[in-house]
Amino acid sequence: MNILKSFSAKGRLCAFVVSAAIMFFSVAANAQVPPRFYWKTLQGTNAVPVIAMSASGNVNPLDPSHNFDPSASLNADIAIAGFAKMMPIGKKAGMLAVLMPMGRIDGDFLAGGSLSRQSSSGFGDPMVEFNMNLIGPAPIMNLPDMLRYEPGFSMDLVVDLTLPLGQYDNTQSLNLGQNRWYGRIGTPIVWQLGSWVPDRRTTLEIFPSVWLFGDNDDFVGEKLQSDPTFELEAHLTRNFTSKFWGSFDATYSSSGDATIAGTTSSGSDMTLVGFTLGYQINESLGLTIGYKSTLNNDSGSNDLQMNNFMISITTGWHRLIEGANRLSSGG
């Protein structure tokens, strides 16, 4: 029974937390991933994230190619629902996740001295993510494994694929769906700093990745081609108590050139900084709140600009945890 109680406490600390943006950031603000997303938990765990995001700036928060108009003033309210399944791949920890964005986006554009307005609402492009650990601890397969878990230094392989199924209007440039296949390959790294004490857990997390894009053959009647976008995300996370933690977040993104109807425009760089706060409500329910903003938000600037606020709630469950809870409660 002592093992069951210890595992219950450990489960509260290590419950799987999703917040998106990931994706997003291209699912939640240009697909940037929330801190602690790639912490490992018991294989076989199921998780359902629900994410709400509000973003503003001059770039579509659902387009990681950063195809933007400096004169634009955009606002987006996005909700994201998903499902994730932790599963071993051979002797390695793995995960398969699906995320579906929905909501509305609108914006004003200055063209020829006059102001025009565009808007889009409905579903965005769904994303599928595959994750496999390359370096790090063995998969957490049972209760004793969970008690012994420490991330140490771990590195994963992540492959994302976004399907062109979202709302798209070929008469305008602003859409929830992007009308093309695109995806990401990356290697997220989690580095444990110091001892793994529940109320003082500290990690440095780094995620280099590259986005690859297919062609959009009907971008306002023309063909849009985008070179790869390179991203580097970093998070320094720290527990303040056993249930409450925070993170300092930074993202650097360098988009490739875009070619529309044979005319090429140069890519742009963007640096965002912000914070995330997380709270483990109970062993199966987690809450995160985060904010990020580009460093240069001067009015009239030709730089990429974005402000993003996100809140997420994630629930998770596993048959072993549920069984342990029933035994510990005498049910």
Predicted segments, located by residue:
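Residues that define the transmembrane beta-barrel architecture of outer-membrane proteins
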Residues: 44, 73-81, 121-128, 153, ...
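Outer membrane beta-barrel transmembrane domains
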Residues: 61, 216-331
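Surface-exposed strand-loop-strand hairpins of Gram-negative outer-membrane beta-barrel proteins
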Residues: 55-78, 113-116, 170-175
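N-terminal signal peptide c-region/cleavage motif recognized by signal peptidases
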Residues: 26-28
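Short loop/turn motifs that connect adjacent beta-strands in outer-membrane beta-barrel proteins
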Residues: 36-44, 87-95, 136-154, 194-202, ...
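Outer-membrane pore/translocation modules
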Residues: 104-226
